[in-house]
């Protein structure tokens, strides 16, 4: 699996891996890169089956497989310890890694994630799957912003959304891959294991998230010992995009608290 590994700002700088949600694209974190790259070595990637890592996925694709794919790629690049910032599905990958390979994960930032899929989120995905089966990639892509962004934010950016739709359709991961990745997401359940997560953990949610209720993050915090939680009052499911300034402040402050480092003296 191909990774996008940025230069380290100094030798030995902490590594921060950025993992997107169901869309899978590493470009999802564009609004965070400038805020992080002076302090951390950033690693982003397109999830297997998407973008630069396109290709058919196995029938029994699972969250454990997604986590192992990422870990193997990082190890092949010489990265053995890292923090992970994950959004939704990416947060689940982080949870899986922290449980399966705790020695590798220095910290977690879980953005609009969950322990187990809520009935509300399951209903949202059922509606989206029906759209996919009835209208194909175009219907899936055109409906997606409704679950990601607040209405006023979308209304003020229609040309941008139309351009994003066209790009997403042209780079669509494929119906079969999408359904396999979605099935892995729906089957993931960390409710019995989350108490074993030992690394520092920051949980970020948005109060107006339509797809994943903010209450899921409250449940997540209660399940992970010593975890911290910040709830943004606005921003929707993609709050790191719609209110990047607020999100980046939360993210940078959280990482600084969890990954205290001394910059190399020059």
Swiss-Prot record:
Keywords assigned by UniProt?
Answer: Hydrolase
Q: What does this protein do?
A: Involved in pyrimidine catabolism. May facilitate the hydrolysis of carbamate, a reaction that can also occur spontaneously.
Which terms under GO biological process does the entry name?
nitrogen utilization; uracil catabolic process
* This protein's name: Putative carbamate hydrolase RutD
Organism of provenance:
Klebsiella pneumoniae (strain 342)
Give the enzyme's EC designation: 3.5.1.-
Family the entry assigns: Belongs to the AB hydrolase superfamily. Hydrolase RutD family.
Q: Which gene encodes it?
A: rutD
The GO terms this record gives for MF are:
hydrolase activity, acting on carbon-nitrogen (but not peptide) bonds, in linear amides
Give me the reactions it catalyses.
Answer: carbamate + 2 H(+) = NH4(+) + CO2
Q: What class of enzyme is it?
A: hydrolase
What residues does the AB hydrolase-1 domain cover? 14-238
